[in-house]
UniProtKB/Swiss-Prot annotation:
GO CC entries: cytoplasm
Keywords: Chaperone, Cytoplasm
Function: Together with the chaperonin GroEL, plays an essential role in assisting protein folding. The GroEL-GroES system forms a nano-cage that allows encapsulation of the non-native substrate proteins and provides a physical environment optimized to promote and accelerate protein folding. GroES binds to the apical surface of the GroEL ring, thereby capping the opening of the GroEL channel.
NCBIfam families tied to this protein: PRK00364.1-2 (NF001527), PRK00364.2-2 (NF001531), PRK00364.2-4 (NF001533), PRK00364.2-5 (NF001534)
Pfam families: Cpn10 (PF00166)
Name of the protein described by the UniProt record: Co-chaperonin GroES
Entry similarity comment: Belongs to the GroES chaperonin family.
Annotated source species: Acinetobacter baylyi (strain ATCC 33305 / BD413 / ADP1)
Entry-linked PROSITE patterns: CHAPERONINS_CPN10
Amino acid sequence: MSNIRPLHDRVVIRRVEEETKTAGGILLPGSAAEKPAQGEVIAVGNGQITENGVRALDVKAGDKVLFGTYAGTTVKVNGEEFLIMKESDILAVLEG
């Protein structure tokens, strides 16, 4: 993992690569394959600052999460691509 530390209520996510083949075996060109909306949390910020103090985040490093296809900002660090997004852009945590 590269040295990247998100601030406040932001999280760093590594996308999980999606299949480039359909269930029927048809290969999808790069432009037709949608970006995956699933990834692994790599790092989390300290929490959201509220009037009552800081609220800790519900996700933690290592969680597998679902997020909107266009959520977050893509950044490249040491040649590796990550997404930085607010915790509120995460739709669900995959358990099990």
